[in-house]
Regions:
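Long C-terminal subdomains/extensions of small-metabolite kinases
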Residues: 1-171
């Protein structure tokens, strides 16, 4: 499960409405939709300043931010392994912030995110928490598990105490 504000959410928003997705899905090339939309959004979205505050009160301010995502699993839409250390069983949220990079560097880093290799580069910040508030200097697209939540300048994410139990048939 993930939620994000900025570039990743803008991609989710656009993928939901583009006719390109249905066409590429019919060709079994649906993941290319994310690539095409990501390239377009990378060229048009303006980086912002964001403040990330965790439950401990620790506050970090980032400039020229493309996006911040909060995840409890490794992968986000299109197969991006944005938070390689994330686990659905560790009672922690993983945060990735992508900032202080040129558009060209973001473009070059995106393919490395499929394998989780992007974490080695400057401008990629990872953290963990149980609760976080993210504030942007202007309203940006927000998604929750790939579903658009419209434009927001503040989001608050926390873990619920109860866990979802799923019953599946035995083979």
């Amino acid at each position: 499960v993930s939620t994000g504000i900025g570039f990743d959410a803008a991609v989710c928003h656009q993928v939901m409405v583009t006719p390109l997705k249905a066409f590429l899905n019919r060709l079994k090339l649906g993941k290319l939709t994310y690539l095409g939309v990501a390239l377009h959004k990378l060229l048009t979205l303006k980086p912002v300043t964001m403040t990330v505050t965790t439950e401990t009160g620790e506050t970090k301010t980032y400039h020229k931010v493309y996006f911040t995502a909060v995840m409890n699993l490794k992968y986000e839409g299109g197969g991006f392994n944005f938070c390689p250390a994330a686990s659905g069983t560790d009672d922690r949220l993983d945060i990735i912030t992508v900032s202080e990079l040129t558009r060209l560097k973001v473009l070059c880093l995106l393919p490395t995110a499929f394998k989780g290799w992007h974490t080695r580069f400057r401008g990629i910040t990872l953290d963990t928490c149980t609760e976080v508030t993210i504030t942007s200097d202007r309203a940006l697209p927000v998604h929750t598990d790939g579903e658009p939540v419209f434009l927001q300048s503040d989001i608050h994410v926390h873990l619920e105490k109860e866990k979802l139990r799923i019953i599946t048939p035995c083979k």
